[in-house]
């Protein structure tokens, strides 16, 4: 696939890295020649220096015969104009744009072929807000991913010493919980992936990814770790787009406080939010945290654009008694360094956004992609089509499907029915199949499984 990426920042660069590994023809456009040189040295891609919204630059990048344009520069207007130019002058089939400003996102009908012709709109702030919201709804989870409109969830938790399932084989799970159907999709032990089998033994400190119907998630979590009580008192640092959206979602069911250093922004937040307490000050101030009784806080969310402020305020809050801290970290290289110590959960907004973009690049009928483990693994939702002669999955029991190495099927969703992927479950045409792929090099093989052909014999 020939893809043009506008913007060589964190998202654009990471996306180029993902797609270049998958044998795509990638061209990256940016005004920063130094950044382009760095990418070109590392990756097998073309680069073009220039403004991504200029027709001549798009032509130079190969827009005349490109399959897809992905506009992820830091400027909404550049992204929108680039999609308009690509549509009007080059008839580019698929145009994806990152748009941050709520002023654009709330205008119905703005993004349509007869208006601003963007086929797929990505709002990083909304993606990250939804990600944090799910973590707050599931205390103790490291990740919570949704599939098929929320019917199925894939949850990552850390197994704890003394947990009912620690030291037990996975086959014990079904016998121990006969009324709850679940499947362990993957285990990470000391950062190394393990493909689970019935005789795999769960060890303390394993990071366990399990899949279940939404209604059964808490029951399964209770077997792997101590269930934490629901979060009620939430402190948000940073009143930007993410902080405001999260507060707006939580304020009617939680006690929410926002700490914001900009006085004008504080005034805006106090006018827009109904029940949220808005505090003017610095979250790195020990005095402010003491005055707000930070030791009573159930979860402290540091969501500013400044990694240093987020990390330092989180560490301070944790030392002063906050029960859980969640930290937004824009520099992806820092995520592994800080998570697991005083910072309970570190979130990379770039990594969260990448999955939304990859969903629209995958071959076959792939409707949902989540990038995991800093891009090393993926969770995929694919729709099975065809029949026993044209499909490699339809009409076959899961135990008989020739899955690529390192790939597991976690669940099959048929209409509103959730079928956990035991070996005797037979896939039907139209089923949504949830897969976990621990090795990104196998993604193409997974896509081929769900591509319908005249025959595959």
Curated annotation (Swiss-Prot):
<feature type="binding site" description="in other chain">
    <location>
        <position position="30"/>
    </location>
    <ligand>
        <name>NAD(+) 1</name>
    </ligand>
</feature>
<dbReference type="Pfam" id="PF02254">
    <property type="entry name" value="TrkA_N"/>
</dbReference>
<keyword id="KW-0406">Ion transport</keyword>
<dbReference type="GO" id="GO:0005886">
    <property type="term" value="C:plasma membrane"/>
</dbReference>
<keyword id="KW-0997">Cell inner membrane</keyword>
<dbReference type="InterPro" id="IPR036721">
    <property type="entry name" value="RCK_C_sf"/>
</dbReference>
<feature type="binding site">
    <location>
        <begin position="233"/>
        <end position="261"/>
    </location>
    <ligand>
        <name>NAD(+) 2</name>
    </ligand>
</feature>
<dbReference type="Pfam" id="PF02080">
    <property type="entry name" value="TrkA_C"/>
</dbReference>
<keyword id="KW-0472">Membrane</keyword>
<feature type="binding site">
    <location>
        <position position="98"/>
    </location>
    <ligand>
        <name>NAD(+) 1</name>
    </ligand>
</feature>
<protein>
    <recommendedName>
        <fullName>Trk system potassium uptake protein TrkA</fullName>
    </recommendedName>
</protein>
<keyword id="KW-0677">Repeat</keyword>
<feature type="binding site" description="in other chain">
    <location>
        <begin position="7"/>
        <end position="11"/>
    </location>
    <ligand>
        <name>NAD(+) 1</name>
    </ligand>
</feature>
<dbReference type="InterPro" id="IPR006036">
    <property type="entry name" value="K_uptake_TrkA"/>
</dbReference>
<feature type="domain" description="RCK N-terminal 1">
    <location>
        <begin position="1"/>
        <end position="122"/>
    </location>
</feature>
<keyword id="KW-0630">Potassium</keyword>
<dbReference type="GO" id="GO:0015079">
    <property type="term" value="F:potassium ion transmembrane transporter activity"/>
</dbReference>
<keyword id="KW-0813">Transport</keyword>
<feature type="domain" description="RCK N-terminal 2">
    <location>
        <begin position="231"/>
        <end position="347"/>
    </location>
</feature>
<dbReference type="InterPro" id="IPR006037">
    <property type="entry name" value="RCK_C"/>
</dbReference>
<dbReference type="InterPro" id="IPR036291">
    <property type="entry name" value="NAD(P)-bd_dom_sf"/>
</dbReference>
<dbReference type="InterPro" id="IPR050721">
    <property type="entry name" value="Trk_Ktr_HKT_K-transport"/>
</dbReference>
<comment type="function">
    <text>Part of a potassium transport system. Required for the activity of the TrkH and TrkI transport systems.</text>
</comment>
<keyword id="KW-0633">Potassium transport</keyword>
<keyword id="KW-1003">Cell membrane</keyword>
<keyword id="KW-0520">NAD</keyword>
<feature type="binding site" description="in other chain">
    <location>
        <begin position="73"/>
        <end position="74"/>
    </location>
    <ligand>
        <name>NAD(+) 1</name>
    </ligand>
</feature>
<dbReference type="InterPro" id="IPR003148">
    <property type="entry name" value="RCK_N"/>
</dbReference>
<feature type="domain" description="RCK C-terminal 2">
    <location>
        <begin position="367"/>
        <end position="452"/>
    </location>
</feature>
<feature type="domain" description="RCK C-terminal 1">
    <location>
        <begin position="142"/>
        <end position="226"/>
    </location>
</feature>
């Amino acid at each position: 696939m020939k893809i043009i990426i506008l913007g060589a920042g964190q998202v654009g660069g990471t996306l180029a890295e993902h797609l270049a590994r998958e044998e795509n023809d990638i061209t990256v456009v940016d005004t920063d020649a130094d950044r382009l040189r760095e990418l070109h040295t590392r990756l097998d891609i073309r680069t073009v220096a220039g403004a991504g919204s200029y027709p001549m630059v798009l032509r130079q990048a190969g827009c005349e015969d490109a399959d897809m344009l992905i506009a992820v520069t830091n400027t909404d207007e550049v992204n929108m104009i680039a999609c308009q130019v690509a549509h009007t002058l080059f008839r580019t089939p698929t145009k994806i744009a990152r748009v941050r400003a709520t002023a654009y996102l709330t205008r119905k009908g703005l993004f349509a072929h007869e208006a601003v012709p963007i086929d797929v709109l990505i709002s990083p702030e909304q993606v990250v807000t939804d990600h944090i919201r799910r973590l707050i709804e599931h205390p103790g989870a490291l990740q919570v991913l949704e599939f098929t409109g929320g019917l199925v969830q894939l949850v990552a938790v850390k197994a704890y010493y003394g947990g009912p399932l620690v030291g037990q084989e996975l086959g014990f799970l079904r016998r121990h919980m006969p009324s709850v159907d679940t499947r362990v999709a993957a285990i990470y032990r000391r950062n190394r992936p393990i493909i689970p089998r019935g005789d795999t033994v769960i060890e303390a400190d394993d990071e366990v990814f399990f899949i279940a119907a939404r209604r059964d998630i808490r029951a399964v979590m209770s077997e792997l770790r101590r269930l934490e009580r629901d979060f009620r008192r939430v402190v948000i640092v940073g009143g930007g787009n993410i902080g405001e959206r999260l507060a707006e979602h939580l304020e009617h069911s939680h006690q929410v406080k926002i700490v914001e250093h900009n006085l004008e922004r504080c005034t805006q937040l106090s006018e827009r939010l109904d029940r949220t307490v808005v505090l003017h000050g610095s979250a790195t101030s020990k005095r402010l945290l003491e005055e707000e009784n930070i030791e009573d806080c159930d979860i402290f969310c540091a969501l500013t654009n400044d990694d240093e402020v987020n990390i330092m305020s989180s560490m301070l809050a944790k030392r002063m008694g906050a029960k859980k801290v969640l930290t937004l970290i824009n520099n992806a290289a820092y995520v592994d360094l800080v998570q697991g110590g005083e910072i309970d959960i570190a979130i990379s907004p770039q990594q969260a956004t990448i999955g939304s973009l990859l969903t629209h690049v995958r071959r076959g009928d792939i409707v949902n992609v989540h990038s995991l483990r800093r891009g090393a693994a993926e969770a995929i939702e694919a729709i099975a089509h065809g029949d026993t002669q044209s499909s490699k999955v339809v009409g076959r029991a899961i135990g008989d499907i020739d899955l690529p190495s390192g790939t597991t099927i976690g669940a099959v969703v048929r209409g509103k029915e959730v079928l956990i992927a035991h070996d005797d479950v037979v896939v039907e045409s139209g089923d949504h199949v949830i897969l976990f792929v621990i090795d990104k090099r196998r993604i193409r093989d997974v896509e081929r499984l769900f591509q319908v052909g005249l025959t595959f014999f």
